[in-house]
């Protein structure tokens, strides 16, 4: 993907993030994600019903990479089975860590494929994905 297209996608999701604002409703699984190396501090609410990710909401303060990657993650994961969402997250983590991954399932998240060239930004790109993974893994354990 062209660098200018990547930049445009990242900026769009940073300036107009999807699902910003917490619901505070029952049924949402909650997780707080904090970075030790950046200003990133994001609260996530994740609604899973019948093994499907129905909604993900977020709020907090974060840099452009963290905010945009959260927005893109939300776009990709809503409507997915928990197992499929976890597979996408695992592939995203592999991409960020320069391991072999399946780019076909990453959709717009592929814009972060070069983030490893900026090691100080890797945590920003991974923060909410790892928080979501933790919540979904815990939910999957309850189901099984």
Provide a role label for each language-model segment.
Residues 1-144:
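Domain-level signature for proteins that mediate thiol-based redox and metal-cofactor handling
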């Amino acid at each position: 993907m062209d660098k200018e297209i990547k930049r445009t996608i990242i900026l769009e999701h940073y300036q107009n993030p999807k699902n910003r604002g917490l619901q505070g409703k029952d049924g949402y699984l909650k997780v707080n994600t904090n970075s030790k190396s950046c200003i990133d501090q994001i609260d996530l609410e994740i609604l899973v019903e019948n093994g499907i990710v129905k909604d993900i909401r977020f709020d907090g303060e974060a840099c452009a990479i963290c905010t945009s990657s959260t927005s893109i993650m939300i776009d990709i994961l809503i409507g997915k089975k928990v197992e499929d969402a976890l597979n996408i997250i695992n592939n995203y983590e592999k991409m960020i860590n320069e391991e072999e991954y399946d780019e076909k399932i990453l959709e717009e998240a592929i814009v972060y494929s070069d983030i490893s060239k900026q090691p100080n930004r890797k945590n920003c790109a991974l923060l909410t994905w790892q928080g979501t993974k933790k919540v979904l893994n815990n939910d999957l354990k309850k189901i099984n």
